[in-house]
Amino acid sequence: MVKHQQTPAYIAAILYSFIIGLSFLFVKIALQTAEPFDILAHRFTIAFAAATVPILFGWVKLSIRVKDVIDILPLALLYPALFFSFQAFGLVYSSSSEAGIIQAAIPIFTMVFAAYVLKERPTWTQKGFTVLSVAGVMFIFVMKGVDVESASLKGSLLILLSALSSAMYNTAARKMTQRFKLTELTYIMSAIGFVVFNAIALVRHGAAGTVGTYFLPFREPGFVLAIVYLGVLSSLVTSFLSNYTLSRIEAFKMSAFNHVSTIVTMIAGFVILNESLAWYHLAGAVCIMIGVVGSNINLEKKTKRPGMPAKK
């Protein structure tokens, strides 16, 4: 029965990985027209608008009290607010390769947090497979080249804080999905992202005296296409898929699927953007896939029941 209930969760996790993996292509398109924080602001504006439409038409019913918002607020601040903010500021001082290596450790951080907070007890083989998937991602970024001399302590710290925010979100969301409806969690997360990133972007534009250019990127059809994908699919839909998956399987298992998006990004870059695909990409991808599958399968005879039961 449990395995049958978990099947949709794994489908959701795979779909989540594909959407996130492809999102990097649309981020590249959006960056040709707008600044990173403007992109974040616009994508969560689209996400919040898309989440509000079915509520206005009565297709989705929400029964959110002020107390519920206060309870969910810390979760929404961890992701998307803190995760994307630390990441965006961190990338100003760090290379994408350095950031990729640090954020590859998110499943390990999640495993540690989940062990203490949720009492999740992965087996030693699951721990080993998780480390293997992390090593696969790190191997790819290391082989691509990391400029150690230009590495910034400030940038590394900000990226680390971004990774910790994601790990804490995975852990907290696992518990919150047992208390609140997935639509409620997703809606409030979108609302917080909308408020936080628009505030940051407008303050930055206000300081630079460029508020009048805030919506200029929407003149470009390519930007509109990219921001709709990032807002509706990569923000709203993935938030729902992530919350759904975390309501069914352990946090450390879901976290491992983040690495699958790395493979999707590599394949999409190779097929669509004609980017090179070297042997170390393939070697790393094999390690990632073996690690993700292995971390989600218990190969030991005795299975310790996870601390957080699956939501029925």
From Swiss-Prot:
Keyword Repeat on entry: yes
The entry's keywords: Cell membrane, Membrane, Repeat, Transmembrane, Transmembrane helix, Transport
Keyword Oxidoreductase annotated: no
Pfam entry (one): EamA
Transmembrane segments: 11-31, 46-66, 72-92, 98-118, 128-148, 155-171, 183-203, 221-241, 254-274, 277-297
Localization annotation: Cell membrane
Membrane topology, as annotated: Multi-pass membrane protein
InterPro entries linked: AA-Vitamin_Transporters, EamA_dom
GO cellular component: plasma membrane
Main location: membrane
Entry superkingdom: Bacteria
Domain spans labelled EamA: 18-142, 164-297
Family according to the record: Belongs to the EamA transporter family.
PANTHER family per the UniProt record, alphabetical: INNER MEMBRANE TRANSPORTER, S-ADENOSYLMETHIONINE_S-ADENOSYLHOMOCYSTEINE TRANSPORTER
Name of this protein: Uncharacterized transporter YcxC
Organism: Bacillus subtilis (strain 168)
